[in-house]
Amino acid sequence: MIKLVLLRHGESVWNKENRFTGWKDVDLTEKGVQEAKRAGEFMKKEGLDFDIAYTSVLKRAIRTLNLALNEMDLQWIPVNKTWRLNERHYGALQGLNKSETAEKFGEEQVLIWRRSYDTPPPALEKSDERYPGHDPRYKDLTEAELPLTECLKDTVERFLPYWHETIAPTIKSGKRVIIAAHGNSLRSLVKYLDNISDEDIVGLNIPTGMPLVYELDDDMKPIKNYYLGDPDDVAKAMASVANQGKAKA
């Protein structure tokens, strides 16, 4: 039986401030650091082991992975970083407070922007400092690959080719894999693995810093999945993610 572990980064500074983060390279909070370490402790206690890791080019995911692997004495394993595992780009919403945006545009509209499959937020202009083309880490990307905004469908379309061409063959070769990434890049993979409909994906929330274990058969089809940690803590964390886009009472 194959085990694949998905880990959303620990709480970031902009998670704490309830801002749309996207491709902005913000760091972990102290709580996020502790979440990452705790994730490593849970995985070690579970007896998990890894041969190779995949993450994004954003420090909140990279640091989470490093902190978790350190708890497992696995910092020596190869780590592949790719922009294809980045969070979805939130376009002109990037940096805005989610509750204030809900007050301005309505909770329903913000929920559509945050969670719908194929409705992107308002796009950036290329002259905007938030446009990824101004960031040297993306200098090798084509203009077509640099997003002005993204919906989940766009994130799926940039992630899945990497899954099929790189990660899945690595797993099939017998390597034990962990993917440390972001809420929406991981939602993209979960949607594919569990064959979740475009409509039902709206209700899927992935909490920060909690390892999600997939048990797969030899055809890479899920047998079951489960979070490591206290079930009540997992439920509370998922509810917290769901409530981020609501207007302040």
UniProtKB/Swiss-Prot annotation:
Q: Which domain of life is it from?
A: Bacteria
UniProt EC number: 5.4.2.11
Please, one GO biological process term? gluconeogenesis
Catalytic class of the enzyme: isomerase
Q: Indicate what this protein is called per its UniProt record.
A: 2,3-bisphosphoglycerate-dependent phosphoglycerate mutase
Please report the organism this UniProt entry assigns to the protein: Chloroherpeton thalassium (strain ATCC 35110 / GB-78)
Q: Which reaction does it catalyse?
A: (2R)-2-phosphoglycerate = (2R)-3-phosphoglycerate
Chain sites annotated for binding substrate: 8-15, 21-22, 60, 87-90, 98, 114-115, 183-184
Q: Which PROSITE patterns match?
A: PG_MUTASE
HAMAP family the record matches: PGAM_GpmA
Q: Which UniProt keywords apply?
A: Gluconeogenesis, Glycolysis, Isomerase
PANTHER family for this protein? PHOSPHOGLYCERATE MUTASE
Q: Residues in the active site?
A: H9, E87
NCBIfam families in alphabetical order:
pgm_1, PRK14115.1, PRK14120.1
**Family matches, as SMART domains:** PGAM
- Tell me if Isomerase is a UniProt keyword of this record: yes
